[in-house]
Curated annotation (Swiss-Prot):
Gene that produces this protein: cysZ
The protein's name in its UniProt record: Sulfate transporter CysZ
Primary role: High affinity, high specificity proton-dependent sulfate transporter, which mediates sulfate uptake. Provides the sulfur source for the cysteine synthesis pathway.
First-listed, main subcellular location of the protein, grouped into a coarse class: membrane
GO molecular function: high-affinity sulfate:proton symporter activity
Membrane topology: Multi-pass membrane protein
Source organism of this protein record: Escherichia coli O8 (strain IAI1)
Cellular compartments annotated: Cell inner membrane
Length: 253
């Protein structure tokens, strides 16, 4: 089925909603199964453990609040919870994406072919295995870009006042952008677009990508829904690629 998508500007919210629709398309479901299983097993177990630890971690975080901000504790406590969920959710979604990266790339490739009517390269299981080193190198590039920026934000958490007020907002914005990079990269990488060029392309539609990443980040924090977010985000990002970037960057048509 050739997509009826057009190049007309769409919001990131639209593409996130499209991900939920596309993930259940006939012919696509079988490519969803493995990423879905990886996410359910890893994120399900991780968040179950997290919720058993929150009553220890949150008081520890709140102990960094200076005395002059104690009157804001009723506002800072939920910010502390959200901060933990953001950091924890992104950390484990990164691990899940590393494990499922070859299958996410295949899902993006098959969905793109269905949306456009294009013929993808003939890649079976041996093609996927051959591509694993390149895919893992790409995942490492993303992690190397993410890590120093995340460390700076984590250090800011330790600064009294700023760490409990401003940093959670900065972390949410950073997570939104990083998740846009994470999921939009699969269709870009399928066409061998360099990592730096991909980031430059995303910046041309920064608001759209921030909207998409923000919703993905929010759903990553929600129990049960976060179990399904990986394939949904891959599908939504692929729809965005088809609309916004494919004409300029596609290697196969």
């Amino acid at each position: 089925m050739v997509s009826s998508f057009t190049s007309a500007p769409r919001s990131g919210f639209y593409y996130f909603a499209q991900g939920w629709k596309l993930v259940s398309q006939p012919g696509i479901r079988r490519f969803v199964i493995l990423p879905l299983l990886v996410n359910i097993l890893l994120m399900g177990g991780a968040f179950w453990w997290l919720f058993t630890q929150l009553d220890v971690w949150i008081p520890t975080l709140m102990s960094y609040v200076p005395d002059w901000l104690q009157w804001l504790s009723y506002l800072l406590w939920p910010l502390a919870v959200i901060s933990v969920l953001l950091v924890f959710g992104y950390f484990f979604s990164t691990i899940a994406n590393w494990i499922a990266a070859p299958f996410n790339g295949l899902l993006a490739e098959q969905l793109e072919a269905r949306l456009t009517g294009a013929t993808p390269p003939d890649t079976g299981i041996f093609g996927i295995m051959k591509d694993v080193p390149r895919i893992m190198k790409r995942e490492w590039q993303k992690f190397a870009w993410y890590l120093p920026r995340a460390i700076v934000l984590l250090i800011l958490y330790l600064i009294p006042g700023i760490g409990q007020t401003v940093t959670p907002v900065l972390w949410f914005l950073f997570s939104a952008w990083m998740l846009a990079i994470q999921y939009c990269d699969y269709p870009f990488d399928n066409h061998k677009v360099p990592f730096k060029e991909m980031r430059t392309a995303l910046r041309t539609r920064k608001i759209t990508n921030m909207q998409f990443g923000a919703l993905t980040s929010l759903f990553t924090m929600i129990p049960l829904l976060n179990l399904f977010i990986m394939p949904v985000a891959v599908c939504g990002a692929t729809a965005m690629w088809v609309d916004c970037y494919r004409d300029k960057h596609a290697m196969w048509r």
